[in-house]
Amino acid sequence: MATEVEKTESTPPHRILSIDALRGFDMFWIIGGGSFFEVLLGLTGWSIAPSLTTQLEHVEWEGFRFYDLIFPMFLFLVGCVLPYSLDKHRNSPKAVYVRILRRTLTLVLLGLVCNGLLDFHFSELRVAGVLQRIGICYGLAALICVHVGVRGQVMALISILLGYWAIMAWIPVPGGVAGDFTPQGNLCGYLDRNFLPGKIKKEYYGFGDNEGLLSTLPAVGTVLLGSLAGAWLKSGARPWWKVIGLAAAGLSSLALGQAWGMAFPIIKDRKSVV
């Protein structure tokens, strides 16, 4: 009879196929799936092809298209695996904190290297970036998940979203007016221009950085939303109840987001939608 150690070593780690499938779908678009589909649609000659191709481009400011959801989806997936990855080290608090810190610093450092850190032209260095945001959001959301349960995570998510909305809607920039969501007048851009180290480059929004300081808050909310979905998947609920629960939560979130968007415009660069 195999020993417990032998069983542990021979048993492959449990994979959540739904998370793996969604991650693969997301990575397909990240690595250039849009270009493939643009060519494919161009060959079809369909009358609807131009409209579909438009969905493979980022919206300039307000609103969103399909391509604007790819990076938020990745942050959501980062959150989905938190209930599984953190549980492995629940009995060793030190190991949990070391894991979180190591992953956060690794992602931030890799992002800086991708932005040209090793060129040592620090005045031209873009400090913000996609990997940096993933690392910081992972770190902050993971710390929240370590210290509070599902109810605490729900409260943290609500507090983050309402707090971000209140800050953006009620605090004006110097010389401006409260609730200005234009590219030039919003609070996120002002804080980036005045407090974000490094260079703010035109191709990353220009009046601020689309991965800047204040907009990190709702991005953390996206990771927490994923963590709640992961906790539901990890629960003892029956498979069909999990499907129904996720579908109901998704539809409710769409309706709530659409309604909230009437007062708080959906702007992907400012992360005013989770």
Language-model segments: which ranges?
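N-terminal signal-anchor module of multipass membrane proteins
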Residues: 2-91, 95-96
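Aromatic-anchored segments of alpha-helical transmembrane domains
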Residues: 32-35, 108-117, 161-170, 250-261
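A conserved active-site cap/scaffold subdomain adjacent to cofactor or substrate pockets
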Residues: 207-256
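Long hydrophobic alpha-helical segments that form multi-pass transmembrane helix bundles
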Residues: 150-221
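Transmembrane alpha-helical segments and their boundary/interface "anchor" motifs
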Residues: 68-73, 86-115, 122-141, 145-164, ...
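Juxtamembrane/transmembrane-helix boundary motifs at the membrane-water interface
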Residues: 36-64, 116-124, 204, 255, ...
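Conserved small/polar residues in nucleotide/adenosyl-binding loops
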Residues: 273-274
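Hydrophobic transmembrane alpha-helices
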Residues: 80-83, 137, 141, 145, ...
